[in-house]
Swiss-Prot record:
EC number: 2.7.11.1
Record lineage: Eukaryota, Metazoa, Chordata, Craniata, Vertebrata
GO MF annotations in UniProt: ATP binding; protein phosphatase 2A binding; protein serine kinase activity; protein serine/threonine kinase activity; transmembrane transporter binding
Residue(s) carrying N-acetylmethionine: M1
Presence of keyword Cytoplasm: yes
Matches recorded under Pfam families: Pkinase
Protein name: Serine/threonine-protein kinase greatwall
Residues annotated as the enzyme's active site: D156 (proton acceptor)
Organism of provenance: Ailuropoda melanoleuca
Domain AGC-kinase C-terminal: 839-882
Amino acid sequence: MEPTAGSEKESEGDTVTGECVNRIPVPRPPSIEEFTIVKPISRGAFGKVYLGQKGGKLYAVKVVKKADMINKNMTHQVQAERDALALSKSPFIVHLYYSLQSANNVYLVMEYLIGGDVKSLLHIYGYFDEEMAVKYISEVALALDYLHRHGIIHRDLKPDNMLISNEGHIKLTDFGLSKVTLNRDINMMDILTTPSMAKPRQDYSRTPGQVLSLISSLGFFTPVAEKNKDSANILSTHVSETSQLSQGLVCPMSVDHRDTTPYSSKLLNSCLETVAPNPGMPVKCLTSHLLQSRRRLATSSASSQSHTFVSSVESECHSSPRWEKDCQESDHALGYTVMSWNIIEKPSCTDSRDAIETKGFNKKDLELALSPIHNSSTIPETGRSCVNLAKKGFPGEVSWEARELDINNIHVATDTAQSGFHQSDQWAVDSGDATEEHLGKRGFKRNFELVDSSPCQNIIQHKKNCIEHKPRNAMSDGYINQRTGLTTEVQDLKLSVCGGQQSDCANKENMVNSFIDKPQTPEKSPVPMIAKNLLCELDEDCDKNNKRDLLSSSLLCSDDERASKSICMDSDSSFPGISVMESSLERQSLDPDKSIKESSFEESNIEDLLTVSPRWQENILPKGDENPAVQDSSQKMLAPSSKVLKTLTLSKRNAVAFRSFNSHINASNNSEPSKMSLTSLDGMDISCVYSGSYPMAITPNQKGTSYIPYQQTPNQVKSGTPYRTPKSVRRGAAPVDDGRILGTPDYLAPELLLGRAHGPAVDWWALGVCLFEFLTGIPPFNDETPQQVFQNILKRDIPWPEGEEKLSDNSQNAVEILLTIDNAKRAGMKELKRHHLFSDVDWENLQHQTMPFIPQPDDETDTSYFEARNNAQHLTISGFSL
């Protein structure tokens, strides 16, 4: 009996196992390896497009790297693009055949339109005649109307994303920034029964393999990632057992395996064998099996829901990408070795030290073995770039909570300082010397941390987790990439009020003050800074060598402003490990140069933006007074002064929430920071601890709850209602959905720049920009820099041609009604159909009309019609690799 043949070519491959046994081939999507890549076509902001061939038919294959989308937190946009194209069956929208993937890439296999994009055609023509522009705008308007009726907003409409078919018609493409209102995954019925195509033509029919590929999961998260959602609870149980040995909080010991030599491995093993039976040494973080238990796939680190969680690098004690051998995306460039030990401050620690020394190893040997820099005893000269290695701790004075636990936690981070920061450097050096002498007398084990700086630190410094104060006059160096025609992420948009420092949100939409997208230049700031720890509980390792996005746990402030500014809230069941920082931002201006993923907090005011800096961070405990009376363990608790109480009770400034590294959060290491709710600072019992000459640290407690020091790790605290949405009392512009502004500057609608809720009207605004560009050859709001473009958009500054170049009244009026600031009054499909400029358009038969330009390629693989845009924007496309 002959086997039944399948209806698809991609169904081949199954064979008959016996003479009398029939096997029906199961439809399956093809593999990307079945496609032959002919040549590159073009490159966009989030992927590259190649000309592919399979079975004698040509396809346009868009390749998107999963790692890039995870790092940019754009996985949901890849899903939205696939869904939007899969749901669309319109003659004016590019047809999607397959959605394929490999371990590293996502492949969207679409129809190849040989005519190139309209941007390239516009570069060749200079500008279009009115008749030609009207035909193109009419077809794009039909495409937008189709998308909007199906709940899809394009949000990146521009001539670059309009392709020309073989017959010269327009088809929209590049839905990478689109918004699909379908609040669920698409299924087979969505693909087969698109509402507008009750009886689809043969052109829109899809084979079973195509349908299966279009509804498949894109694999940004795997079953392993789902299991990791409960891994923190498992770790908490394990930590609970081991915490009985150390009677202290857990802090991870982070050692990069690639930097560990055989000698250092021997030292580590010796230390483990020596201190394991000793209950006075917290060795739980040195156990190797924890590394195995936390191993997970690299692709499991983010999903479409991951933006609601905080990075797991800080939130889970034993989770670090440096412990995972399978996460090797550029990690080889990092040459750091970081250690952080927490030793209980008890006389029994002396015995532990003696025990280690009896085996022939001491801490200095281990220190030298783990760091490639052996000359760590010499402190560099003040005012020069330096790396502080193995700084000594400050056991003389610790916070009240740490003293109750008999814990001495030291956290020293790498500090690359310039001459403007000699005060903080000198403070650290003096304290280290005094502490070394003090430790020699008391015989306690010292806490230490080794940080080896990497040559690539400047490259990855925008991925770090420090916060930099920068004066306003240092923010006007310009925008590095002066081209405004490419899709980009508008990372920083600061709206200012003309004529003074007012807080009236009604005036904040008048102009855009600055838009900066450049590398950090912390050396330019002349203000001396020092990093202050905002956490009451034990600090963890700052993880300086991680190239991924980290949450910040400290805020830089000048020496004269740090007093009475830090408020540390004790963790409760609802908000474990949250510290609150209240700072007067009227006295200084902050640089807004940061991305949403790199920020560790949610802005409470649109003017209160902070700058991410990888440089000036040094998390330290309050400096202890040299007076032995103050260092005595029976230190008195001083009552807060009236000035401090007034600051706490009368100040109504916005607060910024920071989450402790020890907080219990299930998260991925590439996720966006969560937006945490914050309890009111009013009505709290306040206790004050004074630590020598260092400024006060105010520790308010919740009313009605007595303070009990931690006897367990904060990871064991169950959070009651995390990630609650804040009450509707926010001043200023409403935040955008995901907090980011994505798109090309020239085509962004005002509501996007103002951070307001937006809808389909943003596409009609972009259509008005395209109409003006078709008629003149230049976008209406073009300027030299993006910030100037934004000012022109908000002012609606349109340079109308004059004289012989003057546009017709109908054309100018059509642009006017589309470029209306008020999105409620902006023209749409109905207004365009009634407009005099489109009076001669046959809207029902647009796809059958003769187009003014019909491509005439040399052969079917000709891509020359895309070259004009690529050359104008200096785009080069690299090779292809599976």
